[in-house]
Amino acid sequence: MLCFSGTLGCTKYGAFLLILSYRSPMARNDGSSLNESDSCLTTSVTAFFRVMCTEWLSMSAYNKEVKFFELISCLKREPQFSAKDTVKERVLKITLASCCSSLFSIRDITSCPLSSGSSFTKSQTSKMYCQLSLLNLGSVAFNSAFLILIADDDIFVNGFLR
């Protein structure tokens, strides 16, 4: 399971770098530079790093050494924690916030405009960004589910992750 989760992570980061290289000015046929219509790229980068922060928070929940609110601002919808929340409940809230964030990112990405001189059409670019967002969502869901399954295993939580 850990190997599969790692493979998902590498695939996700590789897809991000591939899309980033396609959208760079050097990859364009017309030699134009980045402009306002490339806010799609900014949206994608923001969504990507937001999901990375969510994964980091999920892992830190089990280390119990990192404060939850250090990177919680990365999420569009901040989960509300109470003092009575268990570790598992906090991870569930983080996962839910991440899913909402990814869905909103897909909505934003599919509606962003592209200039007519771009080397990609709107539909092609939107499809690529949507696939990346869905890959992020799937990776977070899988990682969080795995962490929730082992949440009650004190030996794993207190031993392996420390």
UniProtKB/Swiss-Prot annotation:
It is a single-pass membrane protein. The keyword Membrane applies. GO terms for cellular component: membrane. The chain crosses the membrane at residues 132-151. Keywords: Membrane, Transmembrane, Transmembrane helix. It is found in: Membrane. It comes from the Eukaryota. Its main location: membrane. Partially overlaps HSE1. This is Putative uncharacterized membrane protein YHL002C-A. It comes from Saccharomyces cerevisiae (strain ATCC 204508 / S288c) (Baker's yeast).
